[in-house]
UniProtKB/Swiss-Prot annotation:
One of its GO terms (biological process) is glucosamine catabolic process. The gene is nagB. The active site is at residues 62, 128, 130, 135. Pfam families: Glucosamine_iso. It catalyses: alpha-D-glucosamine 6-phosphate + H2O = beta-D-fructose 6-phosphate + NH4(+). This is Glucosamine-6-phosphate deaminase. Pathway: Amino-sugar metabolism; N-acetylneuraminate degradation; D-fructose 6-phosphate from N-acetylneuraminate: step 5/5.
Amino acid sequence: MKIHVVNNQVEGATVALDILREKLNGGTKVLGLATGSSPLEFYRLIRESDLDFSDVTSVNLDEYVGLGEESDQSYIHFMKENLFNTKPFKQSYLPNGLATDVVAETERYNKILAEHPVDFQILGIGRNGHIGFNEPGAPFDGQTHLVELAPSTIEANARFFDNPEDVPKQAISMGIANIMAAKTIVLMAYGQEKADAIKATVEGAVTEDVPASVLQNHDNVILILDQAAASKLV
């Protein structure tokens, strides 16, 4: 792992943008994208940049079950608001949170991922070490699947909803094996609340109890952390 410790999210986003620009210049054609607060500044810098994605495909990590584009809290809505409306891609794929047959939807998405191997994957990390919506205990060999969200994840995401009771309890997520197939992974984490998860990811045992710890087994992982998130690293 390569670790960049930065002073704030803008500085972290600048580091990530520089890496992305280098990869695009080197022929990257498929981006794996994440939602949540960690990549917001990164997406802002992309919107303000001269980068062109007309020949680039994107695939997103996950989507809430039961939410579609009309919902402000769906991830398709998030991506359109924060990136796609300004920087359209050749193709953009997300799981369909309104699919009536979730098993068929996971199979459809796995096929998309097989057809579009990810060159550059952006990740955040949950306080419990989840990546995507792969909660503790998720198998390292897992593919796209239906997830029962952990209480800590539901609690963490409640701030995005007017009514905490409206937070979805399920999601469709890429599996850990899907994530690990990316050629380059850039994980961004900011804030003291992420410090324990980062320590376990970087310095702990590789265990399914800490999903992000599997990144120790990847050949090209870059962590972008602020000083608070990095504060417990030795």
